């Protein structure tokens, strides 16, 4: 091959390569463009400004930027929700703080509830902070506010608790001091000494009982995990609660009557549940006239087990029924002093129920009596896959036989329970089977 032929061949090959490159580029260009665009989008993301705006919008603080003319140039939704800004106008208290901030001071303030804009939520306690936005540009101040309502409520509850405890402990301590003085003054009178010594012992026991209940209530309110969760026989809980107050019932000639053993079971801490039910039994005995009846019944209602304690006592006024589970609340203070009540028993019941994912309810009528119903989740669901194997009726069988079962339950109720159940039934009627929607066919 001559030199000329070699050069000619090289030129042809180069031309072919150029043409092939152009054709390949034309065919691949859409893919390359798409890939480059995708990479550009991935690397671009959101801008820093967009990121900051998003953070400010999502944070729980209310934020607003105001200028020297009181014009709000920036704000987030929380600023309006917490009452800092309304109709682009800064709250008066916040504006006074912002004016000081524009002068170079960092200022803290509180939004006054009475002057909070109507658009803000009620019942809030809002604390704020104003400062200069930039030292180089002193035309703008930034104002932050946050909701501290939970903290304020907690502090108020703590103060009330301390005040209540101080007052309640002062009574037995003062009584023991007076009795001790009387003992010293009657040292030569054996009969008087014996009488006062018995009263000192009563007050000392009352004080010790109150301290123990305070410790128990504090532990329950601490939301600690239940220490000993087991599958518990409800009948054992009932029998142990009655046994704790058998002497008190016998002394007052009060009969504590229960329905037949149920075989029902709950999942929880046996000691706590016995304590809760025993507190209900103790109250029923304490607020019932001598020779009357206190009854205890248990039944399954949905996925919960209900234990009801009914007395034929003095009853609870309607305005007091919402407060009976508060610490130290006692509707009949004179009766409570006579019975030695601490005012903590029902509060303990409430927290025991809550710690078991249950509830406590009350029905009462002055002059008729009261029914307290403790509801605790059952150890096993009501409808199970092995209902047929266990011999238990399936969901629809139980639903179709509901009128007969409810009539039998109604007959076994006390008058107070029957009245309460009638009220509940009238307000909660559902004639459709939860399993089949009313067709009468399970599954």
From Swiss-Prot:
Its EC number is 2.7.13.3. The modification Phosphohistidine is found at residue 167. It is found in: Cell membrane. This is Sensor-like histidine kinase SenX3. The chain crosses the membrane at residues 6-26, 46-66. Pfam families: HATPase_c, HisKA. It comes from Mycobacterium leprae (strain TN). One of its GO terms (molecular function) is ATP binding. The gene is senX3. GO terms for biological process: cellular response to phosphate starvation. Member of the two-component regulatory system SenX3/RegX3. Autophosphorylates, and then transfers the phosphate group to RegX3. It is a multi-pass membrane protein. GO terms for cellular component: plasma membrane.
């Amino acid at each position: 091959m001559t030199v000329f032929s070699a050069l000619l061949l090289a030129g042809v090959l180069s031309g072919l390569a150029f043409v092939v490159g152009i054709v390949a580029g034309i065919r691949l260009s859409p893919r390359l463009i798409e890939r480059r665009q995708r990479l550009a989008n991935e690397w671009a993301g959101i801008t820093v400004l967009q990121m900051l705006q998003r953070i400010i919008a999502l944070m729980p603080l209310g934020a607003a930027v105001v200028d020297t003319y009181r014009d709000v140039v920036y704000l987030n939704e929380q600023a309006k929700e917490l009452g800092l800004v309304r109709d682009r106008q800064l709250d008066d208290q916040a504006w006074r703080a912002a004016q000081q901030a524009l002068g170079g001071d960092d200022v803290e303030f509180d939004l006054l509830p009475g002057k909070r804009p109507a658009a803000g939520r009620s019942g809030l306690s809002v604390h704020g902070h104003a400062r200069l936005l930039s030292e180089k540009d002193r035309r703008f101040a930034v104002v932050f506010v946050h909701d501290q309502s939970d903290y304020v409520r907690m502090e108020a509850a703590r103060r009330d608790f301390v005040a209540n405890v101080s007052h309640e402990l002062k009574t037995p301590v003062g009584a023991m001091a007076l009795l001790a003085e009387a003992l010293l003054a009657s040292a030569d009178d054996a009969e008087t000494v014996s009488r006062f010594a018995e009263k000192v012992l009563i007050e000392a026991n009352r004080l010790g009982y109150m301290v123990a209940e305070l410790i128990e209530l504090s532990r329950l309110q601490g939301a600690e995990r239940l220490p000993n969760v087991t599958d518990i026989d409800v009948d054992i809980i009932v029998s142990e609660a009655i046994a704790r107050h058998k002497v008190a019932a016998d002394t007052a000639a009060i009969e504590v009557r229960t329905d037949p053993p149920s075989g029902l079971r709950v999942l929880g801490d046996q000691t706590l549940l016995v304590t809760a039910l025993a507190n209900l039994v103790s109250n029923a005995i304490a607020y019932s006239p001598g020779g009357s009846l206190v009854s205890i019944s248990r039944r399954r209602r949905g996925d919960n087990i209900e234990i009801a304690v009914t007395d034929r006592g003095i009853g609870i006024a309607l305005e007091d029924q919402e407060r009976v589970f508060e610490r130290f609340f006692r509707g009949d203070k004179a009766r409570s002093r006579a019975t030695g009540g601490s005012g903590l028993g029902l509060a303990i019941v409430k927290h025991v129920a809550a710690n078991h994912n249950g509830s406590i309810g009350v029905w009462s009528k002055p002059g008729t009596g009261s029914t307290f119903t403790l509801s605790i989740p059952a150890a096993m669901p009501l409808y199970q896959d092995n209902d047929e194997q266990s011999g238990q009726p399936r969901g629809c069988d139980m639903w179709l036989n509901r009128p007969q079962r409810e009539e039998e339950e109604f007959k076994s109720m006390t008058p107070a329970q029957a009245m309460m159940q009638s009220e509940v039934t009238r307000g909660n009627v559902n004639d459709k089977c939860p399993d089949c929607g009313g067709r009468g066919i399970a599954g």
